[in-house]
Design a protein with these regions (language model features):
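Predominantly soluble domains enriched in secretory-pathway, periplasmic, or organellar proteins
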Residues: 9-376
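C-terminal motif of bacterial Sec signal peptides marking the signal peptidase cleavage site
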Residues: 4-7
Length: 376
């Protein structure tokens, strides 16, 4: 069932919010209220949108931002690249609009924005938000500048510090008062970057660059403070890989300890389990190879080639986002389909069986869970 709620704005048509009903009854004692999903929208279309699912009402809301902020011109902007909740605020990184939108995480109403050029991903630490940035324009350029990480005060929403890192930085994690940043160098093709920058948080300076692999992208930490880093390769002769970084006994510095011989497009870690999907494009064959796998982070071994166990992965055209419910273990996978029309969000139980699916905005990509009040 789909419900509609129309909105209005002077001299501009507001696309109405649509509601679908999903029967996914939560545990009454759960700490999770729901989740937000940001749809990237095709570059240049200004169609970044925000969806919200509430487990307790069963309502899935498409284009939630427009309903809650009818007077905001151009809505969220162009290409939503990341999303996260810290305290009472929801942060949406809007890459090609060069800003981070900040909303009330309970109501979805706009609180402000932080202007950051070509912003990519956001992480949080001790009252601050940290945003990776390509710094330069959205443009393939062999002379593209080095990127940076911006520090934002989460109370004032002002940029407080900035540090230069490698070329075209992507995801980040913080371990023991050090930030690790995956540098891609994607704008400087074929001269990709191959390093992880290390930032000492106390004085916010880059203190090291760790050689890992070319064209780095994803970077996640596990419960043992190991780092899992993905390389996209060069899409031709140098294949994508996943690397594990850990500290040698008696040393404080991270080093590459393991190389896993397969590609990873995106991943999420829950407990000792790393779920990933891989969409590997080959320029020679002009085709994708898609896999859904599980890695045991303790043994660093691939334990499954397909976490979807009922055959319904055949319904997915292009996996584009992944998340795991922190309590139930339900696995959420988004499908970008053809990149220019509505996508689909799939929910699988922890055993890999499809529970439900729902239509989303264009290019559904990034998910963050909202806790119930009193459970933050």
């Amino acid at each position: 069932m789909t419900l509609f709620l129309a909105g209005c704005r002077h001299d501009e048509l507001v696309v109405p919010t649509e509601y679908d009903i999903i029967n996914d009854v939560p545990d009454p004692d759960t700490s999770i209220r729901g989740f937000y999903l940001v749809n990237e929208g095709n570059m240049g279309s200004n169609k970044c949108t925000l969806d919200y699912f509430d487990y307790f009402t069963g309502l899935y809301a498409r284009n939630f931002y427009a309903e809650r902020n009818p007077n905001v011109i151009k809505e969220l902007g162009d290409v939503g690249n990341d999303i996260g909740i810290y305290g009472s605020k929801l942060y949406v990184v809007v890459n090609c609009s060069h800003k981070v939108e900040v909303l009330d995480s309970r109501t979805g109403t706009r609180l402000g924005q932080v202007d950051i050029p070509n912003c990519r991903y956001v992480r949080f630490y001790r009252g601050k938000a940290y945003v990776s940035s390509y710094v330069g324009p959205v443009l393939i350029d062999p002379d593209a500048p080095k990127g940076a990480v911006y520090e934002v005060d989460t109370t004032s929403l002002k940029v407080t510090r900035k540090v230069s890192v490698g070329y075209q930085p992507e995801e980040m994690e913080i371990v023991d008062d050090y930030m690790y940043v995956a540098n891609s160098g994607g704008y400087r093709v074929p001269n990709y970057d191959n390093t992880v920058s290390v930032i000492q948080m106390v004085d916010f300076k880059q203190v090291q660059q760790i050689p890992v692999g070319i064209n780095l992208h994803r970077l996640k930490k596990d419960r043992y403070n190991k780092l899992w880093v993905t390389s996209r390769g060069d899409y031709q002769s140098r294949p994508s890989r996943m690397y594990v970084l850990d500290k040698r006994r008696g040393y404080n510095q991270m080093i590459v300890t393991d190389t896993l011989p397969f590609g990873v497009s995106n991943m999420v870690i829950r407990g000792d389990t790393l779920y990933f999907y891989s969409t590997e494009w080959n320029n020679y064959t002009q085709s994708n190879t898609i896999t859904y796998g599980i890695v045991d982070v303790r043994t660093k071994q691939l334990v499954s080639n397909n976490f979807i166990t009922d055959g319904t992965e055949k319904e997915i055209t292009i996996p584009y986002g992944i998340a795991v419910h922190p309590e139930t273990g339900d696995i959420l996978v988004t499908d970008a389909k053809n990149y220019v029309s509505s996508g689909t969000l799939y929910c699988f139980d922890r055993l890999g069986r499809k529970k439900w699916s729902v239509r989303t905005g264009d290019i559904p990509a990034h998910i963050t869970f909202l806790k119930r009040q009193g459970h933050e």
